[in-house]
Amino acid sequence: MGLLVRRLIECFSVGTRFPMQHKIRSVAVFCGSRSGRNPEYASAAADLGRILARAGVELIFGAGHIGLMGVVADAALAHGGKVAGMIPKHLVDWELAHPGITELIITKTMHERKAAMAERADAFVALPGGFGTCDEFFEILTWRQLHLHQKPI
């Protein structure tokens, strides 16, 4: 079991007190639309989806049904979790949206997608991915540096 998974289990264990002002009710997960070369990436994504669902924490993600995005969403759904996906219109047209999620929000642009995810999430997790994942992660990190939010990353 990886360090990320162990830390998440600790965070979402019953009776854990968070060193934050508010309880985490939703987590935005930034990750790849591909699974990557290392099978541990998909395993970590599945573990994360399962942990969030069992803790009653809503998964906020990029709405894709492929790659690590699909893995984390499928795992959360399989364990009774609530899953909200945000996707820009042009990606819906490519038929990339996950058909089984709890809620699908369609945005006009990628920037609106990131803003919607940030607005809805109480915390952020980044898993392996490509340039898009890096863009999402660094934008959230920059917003925190600029004091636009104080949510855990």
PLM region spans:
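A cross-family phosphate/adenosyl-ligand binding-site feature
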Residues: 20-121, 147
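Leucine-biased recognition of intrinsically disordered, low-complexity hydrophobic segments
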Residues: 3-4, 8
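Conserved phosphate- and dinucleotide-binding cores of soluble alpha/beta proteins
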Residues: 107-111, 116-119, 123-153
